[in-house]
Amino acid sequence: HIESLKAPNCSDNINNLTSVPLIREKNTALNGVELVTSVPKANIDFYSRCQAYVSFFLKLKVPKADERHLDDGKHFTKSNINVCYAAPRSKRKARDWYETQLTVGADVYHKEGYHEKNKPFFVITDDGYWFKAHTTSDNNKQFSAVGDELIMGRWLKGRLAAAGIVNPVNNTLEDTDRLGMITQEMLEEYGCD
């Protein structure tokens, strides 16, 4: 019985396999969100082969793990992807853990082809989601989804949660150890900074 596991029809060295797709964890944080649509894999493959008119890298500004409690304004503990740890908008309710405010650097928003302020465009993610986004604020430096400030966070943080790197937090005011705060180490573990 044990010897049958070595049979070629049952297993092989992964280096010998060429047509087996690698499957990563599925981010389900955007499932059922009204302003988000699932995109079939064939469409994702098509769009990935198309040349983009303009592309840019959004640097996520996050603290190191040992800087999670340094609220001096220099360590990004309450801004960008971690804005959920900033002061609540209401005394009765903490900010949602998925709330993010992606601030784009001047090196990006000065690029030719960077989107104009408040002119919506569509984002198609590599993991199969489609939603409308826009830029706002001075110099178009805020990059966010249209109509729901949690969509971008559900996409970014949802991927980290699906990979088992962080657990979503129900109440950021009660997360006194800030274990739900996204850190440089988490991004490095995921494979992107």
What are these regions (language model features)?
Residues 44-191:
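Polyanion-binding interface signature
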Residues 1-68:
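Signature of lipid phosphatidyltransferase scaffolds
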